[in-house]
Amino acid sequence: MTRLAVLLLAGLLPLGVTLSAQGAAKAPRAVVILPFDATALEREEQWIGEGIAQVLSLGLAQHPGFVQIARSRLRSIGTPGAWGDAGALQALRTAHADAVLYGRLERRNGQLVVLPRALEMKGESGTDPLVLEPLPAPDGELLERLAGLPAAYARALRVAVAEPEAARMERAAHPTGSQRAFEFYARGQAASLRGGQQENETAVDLLARAIEVDAQFVVAHYALGVVHQALGNRWKAAAQFRASTQLDATYAEPFKALGDQFMSAPRRLFDQAVEAYSKAIELRPFYAEAHVGLGDAKAAKGDVDGAVAAYKKALVYNPVNPRVHLSLGKIYYAEKGLYYESVNAYKRAIELDARSLEARMGLGEVYEDKGLYKEAIGEYSKVLELDAQHTGALYNLALVFEKVDPKEAIARWERYIRVASQLPAEKDWVDVARQHLRKLRNQLKE
């Protein structure tokens, strides 16, 4: 942890953080939630595996003792047809998680049975498997039976669950009374997690069908908004987020999503973003992502101290969130001139999410600004290994090579222009690149 981060965390502990019996703060458990193996079921029932993962995610989001690591962080290891013990172990290590939650489904004497499992990290490399009690789910009672599963996992992982927390978790884990609507929702979420234009369009169709079956399905409205946002349908996304808040004014996620929209709006809507993030935090004080958003909004308004305070709370509630370390990396260098703290924050973000292009770009820019051109080239090159068409990395690499190898810089500018000239948003930058290219060619002729 950086020196400044240590000082930041020395403040008063925010409400909602779990305490041990001795009164010391207990870090939340970082968990990866995997779809349950449903290959033993008939094809039309296999959506239940993803459905259980969604139930666990919704329920555990209501407890301050857990932070969830996005399944997208596992893309480097691929997506197996079913997550068994070997896949769970690989997921645990890849995500640097404290535990992975998974399991399988089968039918016994015609009745559906859920077989929940978990794998905990012990020490540096050891693991401890946990097997929970089988959960029978008679026909017509699946959603009711699954609602208690998040609290059961919490207790199995030795995380205290007070009665109000258990009630809140169970309520969140039972978002609709219609199994048909929940099936569409689970299938839609599975499609959106696969990513890509076609899968997101499939997700839109499935989530819309979930809402047709149950118009009061708040979580489905929110999820539909998220997918619309991914597709670039900004206004449709906003409509779904607002529908969620109208159906359930206590649901925090859409307020945070609206904050994100305000932050990315063409106009400067930072005050509205602060209001939306603050509302999400009011509803769920330990909502780490909302604290990060609030920090970003305050930083955009020029309130550096307010931003740092928000990031501080985000770190307490979720110390393994790469986004907060990314934001700290930006503010340390740009606003406070703290080189070492910035580098360490960016490196921590990359350690937590090796595919974070933004963190690698930020680290490269800090190195470049300090004249560490070899290190900057290394970071920009890693960005291009992950995304060969990343125009920011192509542009920055060309600039850096101007300092160390003009001939290579010419090749880099030519490559940037080939890629970026097809993109309207890059037009002004392409014009600048052509000026650099002409200047370099003239210099080499002399």
List where the protein language model places each region:
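Structural marker of alpha-solenoid helical repeat scaffolds
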Residues: 213, 247, 283, 317, ...
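A structural "domain/chain start" motif
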Residues: 21-63, 175-181, 185-192, 215-218
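Structural signature of tandem alpha-helical TPR/SEL1-like repeats
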Residues: 198-205, 230-243, 264-279, 300-313, ...
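Helix-start (N-cap) detector for alpha-helical repeat units in TPR-like alpha-solenoids
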Residues: 181, 218-219, 252-253, 288-289, ...
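Alpha-helical segment of the N-proximal tetratricopeptide repeat
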Residues: 179-213, 230, 260-264, 296, ...
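Catalytic-center loop of serine/cysteine hydrolases
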Residues: 54-55, 59, 66, 72-190, ...
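Position-specific recognition of the canonical hydrophobic site in helix A of tetratricopeptide repeat
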Residues: 192, 229, 256, 263-265, ...
